[in-house]
């Protein structure tokens, strides 16, 4: 059984005991988090169910930062060069339970 959840403007396909990296959530390490925006999940015979009341419970493993992305701007023949870096804050979650409340 898997679920498709949405958080941080992105969609993730998750199963129980999966580890995912998502955009930063305001939660401390070890805390349980409930993700209530479930788009779809599968039933007994792997049929897709679209439900409004489902939720996914996850525990926070760590708060970290993603790899650095380099931004480089240049205008030719004008000696204009700008180099900048960015590291996005991430939250690592372990999916503990998929709640199907039909």
Swiss-Prot record:
One of its GO terms (cellular component) is cytoplasm. Signal peptide: none annotated. Keywords: Ribonucleoprotein, Ribosomal protein, RNA-binding, rRNA-binding. GO terms for biological process: translation. The keyword Ribosomal protein applies. It holds the Pfam family Ribosomal_L21p. InterPro entries: bL21-like, bL21-like_sf, Ribosomal_bL21, Ribosomal_bL21_CS. GO terms for molecular function: rRNA binding; structural constituent of ribosome. PROSITE patterns: RIBOSOMAL_L21. The keyword Signal does not apply. Part of the 50S ribosomal subunit. Contacts protein L20. HAMAP family: Ribosomal_bL21 (MF_01363). This protein binds to 23S rRNA in the presence of protein L20. NCBIfam families: L21 (TIGR00061). Belongs to the bacterial ribosomal protein bL21 family. This is Large ribosomal subunit protein bL21. The gene is rplU.
